[in-house]
Amino acid sequence: MSEALKGALIIGQSGGPSSVINASAYGCIRTALDAGCITRVYGAYHGIKGVLNDELLCMDEEDRAELDRLPYTPSSALGSCRYKIKDPDEDDTDYKRILEIFKKYDVRYFCYNGGNDSMDTCNKISKYMKKVGYECRVMGIPKTIDNDLFGTDHCPGYASAAKYIATSVMEVSRDAHVYDTGMITIIECMGRHAGWLTAAAALANEEEPCCDFIYLPEVNFDMDKFVADVSQRYEEKKNCIVAVSEGVPYADGSFVSEAKTAATDGFGHAQLGGLAATLANIMKERTGAKVRGIELSLLQRCAAHCASGTDIEEAFMSGKTAVEQMIAGVTDKLVGFECDRTNGYTCKAKLFDLSDVANFEKKFPAEWITPEGNNVTEDFVKYAMPLIQGETKLEKVDGLPRFARLKKVFAK
C-alpha cells in the first residue's frame, strides 16, 4: 500500500443532477472528514467552474445534522455545471488555473461526480497533473440517470429515476382507465442516445399490464409503424399507454424531437423535448381518439420522495470507496459496480480506468429489445428490478420533505 498522502480534498458535481448524487457526495465527504491524512474537505461550487473561479465550500464547517440529510436530498447540493475543458495540448489555460488553485489550498485529492463528459474532465485533469509533476490523486464517481456509463453494471441515480418512471406509469394507467371513452397516453422519458430510462416503464407491468409499447433510441423510429401499432392496440383495448424516449431517431439519424432552434447544452448536445406533444397531435389527427402527451422532464431526476433505497446505499458506497482508494494510493479510476443476480442480488465496487470510460456510451442491449422494436424483454426486468428495491429514509416536517440546508461557507 502506498503511503497516505497528506493534503486537502475537493469534490465537485457536474452535469445533470439526480435523486442520489448527494448520497455519493456524502459518502465522499464523510469518509474524507474522518481520514487523518486529509487536512481539509472542500466542495467545488458549481463543479469545475468553482475550482476555476476559486469558489470552494468548506465542508468541514457544515453542521453534521445537515450533512447527514444529504443522502436523501435531491439535485446537486454543491451546484453543478456543464463546462467542457479543452484538450491541454490545444489550450492549457484552464489546467494552469486548476493547478494554481490546487497549490493554493494544498489539494492532493480530487473527486468528480458526474457522467460521461465529467469522466473526460477527470481524466484530463489527472493526466495533466502527472505531466507537470504535481502529486494529486484523482477519482471519478459515477452519476447519470441515463445509465450509459461504459463498464459499470449500472450508475447511481438510474435506479431512482427508473423507480419514478415505473411508478408514474402505474399511476397514469389507473387514471387513463377511469372513463368509458378510452384514451391514448404517450409518456416521454429522458434519454438522448440510450434507452435505459424509457425501458423502465416495463417494470410497471409486473403486477398488471400498464405500458403497451416502449420506443427506445437504439431503434430507428418509423412514424407510420408507430401510428399503426398504437391505433391497433387502442382499437383492441380502447386504451393504450406508450413510453417513448426523447432521443428516438429517424433512419437518417435526426431526432424526432430535436428542437427547431437547434439549441445545445454546454457539452454541445442537442436539447431535446416536446416529443410527447408532437406524437399526441399526430395520433389525434390520424385516429380522432382522445390523446394525451405527458413529458416527465426534470421530475425523473429529482423525485427523492420515491428514491430507491438500494440506489441511495450504492451511491454512498461509490463516494466512500473513491476516498478509501485514493488514500490507498489509487488514482485515475472510476468507481463502478460489479453485480451478481444469479442468486438474489449482490453489488460491490469495481474500479475502471478513466480513459476506458471517458466519452463512451453504454447503449441499451439490442438483445433486450423485442424483434418488433417496440418493447423490451424480460431480461431487462430481471436486470433492473433489484435496483429499485428499498425505500428512502427522507425526513418529513409538517408532511413535507426536510432536505439538507448547507451554510455554504466559502474558503478564503
Give the predicted meaning of each segment:
Residues 101, 109-114, 120-135, 139, ...:
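Accessory alpha-helical/coil subdomains and C-terminal extensions
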Residues 2, 53-108, 117-118, 156, ...:
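Glycine-rich oxoanion-binding loops at beta->alpha junctions
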Residues 258-412:
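C-terminal non-catalytic interaction/assembly regions of soluble proteins
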Residues 5-11, 70-84, 143-153, 180-183, ...:
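Gly-rich Lys/Arg/Thr-decorated short loops/hinges at beta-loop-alpha junctions or inter-strand turns
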Residues 2-55:
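N-terminal phosphate-binding or glycine-rich loops at protein starts, especially the Walker A/P-loop
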Residues 18-28, 51-52, 94-96, 116-124, ...:
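Short glycine/serine/threonine-rich phosphate/pyrophosphate-binding segments
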Residues 14-16, 44-50, 82-83, 115-116, ...:
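Short, ordered loop/turn segments at secondary-structure junctions
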